[in-house]
Amino acid sequence: MPIQARIPRTLLLADAAWRLGPGALARYGWHRLALASGQAARRLAGAAVPGGAFLADLPLSPAPPLLQAWQARLRAALAALPPARHHGPFDPMAPALGMDLFRPGDVRPVWEAGRLACLPRLAQAALLWPEAGHRAALEARLTAWCAANPPFQGPHWACGQEAALRALHLALALALLGQDHAPASGARDFLALHARRIGATTHYAQAQDNNHSISEPAGLFACGLLLRDAALRDHGARALSAALARLVAPDGGFAQVSTGYHRLLLDVLAIVEWLRRRHGAPAFPAPFAERAAAAARWLAGLVAPDGVLPRLGHQDGSAFADLALAGPDDARGSIERAMRLFAGASAGFPEEPGCDWLALPAAPAFTPPDFWRAAGSMGWRRDGARALLRTGPLRFRPGQADLLHFELWDGATPVLTDAGTGAYNPAPADRWWLEYFSSAAAHNTITFDGREPMPRAGRFLHARWPRLTALPDGAALRDANGHRHARRVSAEGRLWRVRDEVGGGFSTLALRWRLGPGEWRATPNGAAGPACISIAADAPLTLRLEEGWESPAYGQVRRCTLLVASAAASLRWIETEIGLG
């Protein structure tokens, strides 16, 4: 690459680094130094494959009473387990630290299989049908996985967070089987190896200021708890509470403004809290309880009656510790579990089978507020509809250029939606996903002169973050190009209004509304279909329906419909009315 081409990218990286702050940069620097010096690798030297039994031959407790439909779901899940040996295009014998996790292909599906979500499922099956051989299948699965993945080699050992989630799944499975207080030797060796792996790259986890910073100390806590290592347990507890204090605001907003990663946050917190109570361990240091409850209430206010969440922010399809077997598209089990544990309330899903497995008592119903504001977002509820606005402040790096993005749901029906994620490392023919799904054009907001408000500086990194300010009924931003955009939201019954006021030196602008599923047709003032949308402005507008793209699930992309309003520089405001049926 010629030096002239490198200069702009270097400037973008410098800008992004300045915004991340000295603390994150210092921690990442320590991580790189530990890798380069061999210190991290030395911490992982001399490891052997677990050789003893993973499960003890102990009597099984009866399973909770469960509907036949749920039991059929478990049978289907067991029939679709991934193979124990699954490395995708990655070398299973390569040293895990420093592996190239991008050039060979997308590591995300490989890691999903390596989280061993099958362990709690096999434990559930063993309790439901004790004569069907599922306990032996769980033992065989762990033996086969360890043989296929020697310690600290291959993609499944490349990430501390993945090691933590895998250890948590084993801890949960052992607890369901009643074997977590005195694990068998193979399970103890397995947990000890995972604690070593997590501990080898803690500076990296802390530098991320995202779910890594939560999951990895949670994994250390669980390993210490089951290994009866009080020092490791307490270290994990302190680090987890410190991360929660930094990354979850008192209002429940998470540093990663993403419904998918917020769900993963709650799932991880719920499992370690349940394990802590089960073992009678000391409470997590403050402000763990307060922040966990606030985070649970934030997501409870967004879930649809069928468990679907808005696709706000990055979505990787995680459904961690999914005892309800609901999958990534149904978050009811995650939210109900977290609400009962942390808020002492129900999210409105009292017949939740995952809570039955954990023997969580029923709780009074939680009523979400009609209006709320949290770090990074604000929302409204009116007459069965829910709205969400992506706001500031930008204390942590934004994953997508989704500022002032607005979503609207009518019950379980999405009316205005987010485009989703695509994939983190798609196939060469689909590389356009990386730019498209993270762009402002993939969100319900305004772009000026066809330019992005934040240039991308890396796969998960943007530079030149806009300045955001809060408004009583919305938020406003000013980007690095001098463009100004203020968005205000109001509702009267079933009629919603979004008023956009703009300024700055622009020649053209485009307002995009990404329409939910259904038959939409153009009208003189907008579009009609599952809702009636009309757009007005103080200057002439060009309105059209056009085809776009959305990602309903990780790795999946399909066509969708957009309503686009275009205008010239003389425009100062646009008002959109959405009438719900």
Give the label of every model feature segment.
Residues P2-P50:
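Alpha-helical membrane-targeting segments
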Residues G29, W157-C159, Q208-S213, V308-D316:
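Short coil/turn segments at secondary-structure boundaries
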Residues G29-L101, R108-A113:
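Extended, charge-enriched "interface" segments that sit outside catalytic cores
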Residues A94-A292:
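Aromatic-lined, polymer-binding surfaces characteristic
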Residues A164, D322-A324, P328-G333, T421-G581:
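CBM-like, beta-strand-rich accessory domains located in the C-terminal region of large
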Residues G392, G420-T421:
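Residue-level structural signal for beta-strand termini and adjacent loop
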